């Protein structure tokens, strides 16, 4: 994986790489099971720092996936994500609840008829296993997603 352009695969053979070969790896730094990379490994790669999600990006993604959603209400779901993102950046919560896939899954279940509050509990809140953290995340959801909203209000 360096300038020699080959890999030795134990028990197999030496594999020569085309000049156009690239490897892309991802790492969720700070997640359980990850640790600091050693200097020798880091020196072999370039690092792409991914920016935090913006309201504009989230709106584009969610409008594409949910074109029939009420725009004002969709903005509240985006607000939940952005509020949680800020809390995670400030160290108030872990990044477990900061889950775009969970938000999308919650919106899909709302579209199928589940209440927005229950869907957010399943898709976002219940990703936290610490009771204190779960309460914080639930409070963020409660501020933006009223209990009386139904799936028909969103879609």
Model-predicted segments: where are they?
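C-terminal regulatory/interaction module of P-loop NTP-utilizing enzymes
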Residues: 1-155
